[in-house]
């Protein structure tokens, strides 16, 4: 089973929680998750979102200017391995 999703990684937990809240207010399904190991920096938490909503997430980043963003990533789990690449 293949699971593909987006990850927004930040340097601070406070920014993760703020950005997750803003996305939810805009109707984007989100979840606070442990940051994947391939994204080695940050606070250890990230915001998970559906890849279909990547454009909404990018637009929200531009308008909310959360700061401390490490990056947006595409994560794909194929049942045995998680692969992470810049989105």
Q: Each predicted region: which residue ranges?
A:
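Short, low-complexity, intrinsically disordered N-terminal peptides in bacterial proteins
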Residues: 1-3, 86-87
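Amphipathic, hydrophobic secondary-structure cores in small proteins
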Residues: 4-63
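C-terminal structural segments of small proteins and small subunits
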Residues: 54-87
């Amino acid at each position: 089973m293949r699971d593909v999703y987006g990850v927004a990684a930040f340097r601070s937990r406070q920014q993760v929680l703020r950005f997750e809240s803003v996305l939810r207010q805009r109707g984007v399904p989100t979840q606070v998750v442990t940051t994947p190991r391939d994204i080695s920096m940050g606070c250890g938490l990230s915001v998970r979102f559906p890849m279909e909503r990547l454009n909404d997430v990018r637009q929200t980043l531009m308008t909310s200017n959360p700061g401390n963003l490490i990056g947006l990533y595409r994560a794909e789990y194929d049942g045995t391995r998680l692969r992470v690449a810049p989105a």
